[in-house]
């Protein structure tokens, strides 16, 4: 619970501008881990140089962060939020679990830079994301998806 609270203390700047911060997160994810861009069919044809500032990338980044905000505010009681997310990402999008770990680390960096997430907050965010990803992975296993 304390970890969720520590992250939520710095969530305000993210919530105030989901589109910009979301765009930064996905842009950095695609630059640091180019293989992840292929997992998003609508972004697969966008050149690396054109990712930053792309409206569709920013819009999807906003969607990702809004859902994460819901998960954070649930403070661990997130089964009802996570189950449909796991279902779509396992059965429709086929996103391997490791990609959630990659985006988590990118999020830690962006929140440090843009929302003032200090070292303790970064540890808290890693802990929170670890909980969410473990629960996501448990849902994946129930669905028979070994991503």
Swiss-Prot record:
Q: Which of UniProt's keywords are assigned here?
A: Cytoplasm, Heme, Iron, Metal-binding, Muscle protein, Oxidoreductase, Oxygen transport, Transport
Q: Does the keyword Cytoplasm apply?
A: yes
Cellular compartments annotated: Cytoplasm, Sarcoplasm
What Pfam families does the annotation carry? Globin
User: Which Gene Ontology molecular function entries are recorded, alphabetically?
Assistant: heme binding; metal ion binding; nitrite reductase activity; oxygen binding; oxygen carrier activity; peroxidase activity
Q: What domain of life does the native source organism fall in?
A: Eukaryota
Its quaternary structure? Monomeric.
The family note in this entry says: Belongs to the globin family.
Function, as annotated, reads: Monomeric heme protein which primary function is to store oxygen and facilitate its diffusion within muscle tissues. Reversibly binds oxygen through a pentacoordinated heme iron and enables its timely and efficient release as needed during periods of heightened demand. Depending on the oxidative conditions of tissues and cells, and in addition to its ability to bind oxygen, it also has a nitrite reductase activity whereby it regulates the production of bioactive nitric oxide.
> InterPro entries of this UniProt entry?
Globin, Globin-like_sf, Myoglobin
GO biological processes = removal of superoxide radicals
- Primary enzyme class: oxidoreductase
Q: Which residues are recorded as binding nitrite?
A: 60
Q: Which GO CC annotations does the UniProt entry carry?
A: extracellular exosome; sarcoplasm
What is the protein name stated in its UniProt record?
A: Myoglobin
Residues that coordinate or bind O2: 60
């Amino acid at each position: 619970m304390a970890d969720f609270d520590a992250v939520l203390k710095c969530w305000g700047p993210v919530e105030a501008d989901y589109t910009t911060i979301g765009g930064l997160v996905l842009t950095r994810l695609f630059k640091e881990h180019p293989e992840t861009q292929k997992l998003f069919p609508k972004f697969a044809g966008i050149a690396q140089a054109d990712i930053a500032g792309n409206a569709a990338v920013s819009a999807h980044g906003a969607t990702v962060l809004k859902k994460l905000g819901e998960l954070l505010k649930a403070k661990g009681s997130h089964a009802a939020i996570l189950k449909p997310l796991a279902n779509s990402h396992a059965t429709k999008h086929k996103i391997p679990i490791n990609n959630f770990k990659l985006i988590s680390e990118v999020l830690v960096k962006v929140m440090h830079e843009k929302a003032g997430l200090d070292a303790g907050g970064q540890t808290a965010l890693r802990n929170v994301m670890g909980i969410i990803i473990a629960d996501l992975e448990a849902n994946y296993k129930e669905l028979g998806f070994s991503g």
